Regions:
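Short strand-turn segments of transmembrane beta-barrel domains in outer membranes
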Residues: 146, 151-182, 193, 198-205, ...
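Flexible loop and strand-edge segments within Gram-negative outer membrane beta-barrel domains
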Residues: 198-205, 225-305, 343
């Protein structure tokens, strides 16, 4: 459950195998996710959790770098850090995946429901929770899964602590970042900011990305806590260009989000959480003639959003219920300033009222995990989402888990491609079944396998010849396999294989890679960790076999090497040097020749803590 390729582990000792403990197969260490406050052994869904320490060992710049290593998650292309990219989870595209930061959605509902994971910096992140499969009963619009990002909290032991980091690489690609945090008298603070700039590791893919996040907490007498957060990000980036076809595309993305949260313990077995949030999301898409610098397409969108939630948790992780009420309003404004294509302009307001309940009921080795959610939307159909999951312990080292669910995702909140000039009100919906097992029965080895089958309908598909949006039914089934070993003299191995077969339900035709991700995906990693020497090394591999049109390079294996060396290993605040060599063998991967994965490139940097 708590897996990322090359996560470091402690050696097996008299306290038992760290692999067993970290996966929740013992009761010593909880590993739940935010909406499901349970130990890892009581989660029916297919979940991966990535921690801040694991992220640091990858020398990652953004969430996209981290997702590249997560089993079952695939990116279309990794190019320059901070660039725009697409992604999928077990064949479900990014339009069906909810992305949140501290409970604030990041998806542009008017722009393919895309959240820009390449524009979420990792320095602020405490952990990333990836739920692979329909999760609407707890999360709402999440037909294909959830990427939930939890940012760091203020440190409690010191009045001030911090970090400064800098790196430089190919094509003047730089990443400058810093953070400062501390607590005193019940008040805590966490501040971070930085920039990523590049002339483009790939031609036409230059990046100018700035970001900042602040968080203030106050602990009341009696255990209540208030948290105020503000997140600001902007990015101007080149997307692609081609001298052969004489065109270019650039984009810009702006995020300004804030929230205020209050958590109040009502008793030993009851907690109330109240949150208010709001912000603005802006996006621009510019396309033009490269030789003349003239635009033939210039689209802008703005989404002003606000939301309020109240949730009550009763009981504990083994016997409990979490219920909640939510309200959300999103104002959408769209303009296309050159072609004035019909349906490209819009002024809409989407409102959503929601109520949900999720529970855990444990009897001996069996746990039942039901959930239900009801949404009322002013512009769309009203969905009812439900899930029923279960886990069953088979001894102390093997766990069966599975769930069946019905969920939804929002359609495009736009008139673009409309047949009748009206907004499509039918939701994109899914029924899913997943089941599998997780075991540490083999000494020093952890294994997990999940089988999945998804039936999806009302999937929007733009017909470029007719200029209209059509809908289709799709089915996806496959298997997601993972393994990892306990360390041996500092070395550890992880591996994963994902098979996805995506079909058009009506015709039986295989879906292309843009609709269902790669048919075969293999991820593996070899790590070495020597705490006494202050050295950690990570070698990752990522193989993907995409179903793409002729002329593409759909099959490739990308290898990356990351090395971190502390100069004073005995000190927690030791300065640290690091370097990364990405795409070691300069593999070629692309759908179109003018938009390729990043070639081999190198970067070096350092971190200083205080």
């Amino acid at each position: 459950m708590l897996l990322i390729p090359l996560a470091p582990f402690s050696a097996r000792g008299e306290d038992g195998d760290e692999v067993t403990r970290s996966l929740g197969l013992s009761e010593e260490q909880p590993g739940g996710v935010s909406r499901l406050p349970r130990p890892a052994s009581l989660i029916a869904e297919n979940v991966t959790v990535v921690t801040a320490d694991e992220i640091a060992r990858l020398n990652a710049h953004t969430v996209a770098d981290v997702l590249q290593t997560v089993p079952g998650v695939q990116l279309d292309l990794l190019q320059t850090p901070g660039a725009i990219l697409l992604y999928d989870i077990l064949g479900s595209s990014n339009r069906h995946i909810l992305v949140q930061i501290d409970g604030v959605p990041q998806n542009f509902v008017s722009s393919e429901n895309l959240a820009h994971v390449g524009m979420i910096p990792v320095q602020m992140i405490e952990r990333i929770e990836v739920i692979k499969g329909a999760a609407s009963a707890a999360w709402g619009s999440a037909l294909g899964g959830v990427i939930n990002i939890v940012t760091k909290s203020p440190v409690t032991e010191r009045g001030a602590a911090g970090l400064a980091s800098a790196s430089i690489g190919r094509k003047a690609t730089s990443d400058l970042r810093g953070e400062v945090t501390g607590s005193s008298g019940g008040v805590g603070y966490y501040l971070t900011g930085g920039t990523i700039r590049s002339d483009g590791v790939v031609p036409g893919n230059d990046v100018d990305f700035g970001h900042g996040l602040g968080k203030i907490t106050y602990d009341f007498i009696g255990g209540a806590r208030a948290t105020l957060g503000l997140d600001v990000r902007y990015a101007d980036t080149g997307i692609m260009s081609s001298a052969r076809y004489d065109f270019f595309e650039t984009g810009a993305v702006r995020y300004l989000n804030g929230y205020l949260a209050l958590q109040v313990p009502l008793s030993g077995r009851a907690t109330l959480e109240v949150t208010g949030r709001g912000g603005v999301r802006d996006a621009e898409d510019r396309r033009g003639v490269l030789s003349q610098g003239l635009l033939f397409f210039n689209a802008e969108s703005r989404e002003v959003h606000q939301g309020y939630t109240a949730a009550l948790t009763l009981g504990d992780a083994r016997q409990g219920v979490k219920t909640g009420l939510e309200f959300e309003r999103i104002g959408v404004t769209q303009r296309e300033l050159v072609q004035r294509v019909p349906g490209s302009d819009a002024d809409l307001t989407l409102t959503r009222y929601s109520a949900y309940a999720n529970g855990t009921f444990t009897v001996g080795r069996l746990s039942l995990l039901p959930g239900v959610r009801v949404d009322h939307l002013n512009l769309l159909d009203d969905p009812v989402s439900a899930t029923m999951g279960a886990t069953l312990r088979l001894g102390e080292s093997t766990l069966l888990r599975g769930y069946a669910a019905r969920g939804y995702s929002l359609p495009l909140i736009s008139f673009y491609g409309s047949v009748n000039g009206q907004l499509q009100h039918e939701l994109q919906q899914v029924t899913t079944v997943q089941w599998g097992l997780e075991s540490t029965a083999v000494p020093y080895l952890w294994l997990k396998g999940m089988v999945f089958r998804n039936n999806v309908w009302n999937v929007q598909d733009y017909d470029y010849q007719a200029g209209i949006m059509r809908t289709q039914r799709q089915r996806r089934h496959g298997v997601d396999l993972e393994l990892r070993t306990s360390p041996w003299h500092g070395f550890a191995l992880t591996g994963a294989y994902t098979f996805t077969d995506g079909r058009n339900t009506k015709t039986g035709a295989e879906l292309d890679g843009n609709q269902s991700g790669p048919r075969h995906a293999v991820k593996g990693a070899l790590s070495y960790d020597n705490a006494a020497a202050g050295l950690s090394c990570v070698l990752t591999g990522n193989y993907a076999d995409w179903n793409l049109a002729p002329g593409a390079r759909p099959v490739a294996t990308l290898f990356d090497l990351h090395v971190n060396q502390k100069l004073r290993p005995a000190q927690d605040t030791s300065p640290e040097l690091f370097f990364s060599l990405r795409n070691i063998f300069d593999a070629k991967l692309y759908q179109y020749e003018f938009r390729q994965a990043a070639p081999r490139w190198f970067e070096i940097g350092g971190r200083f803590r205080f």
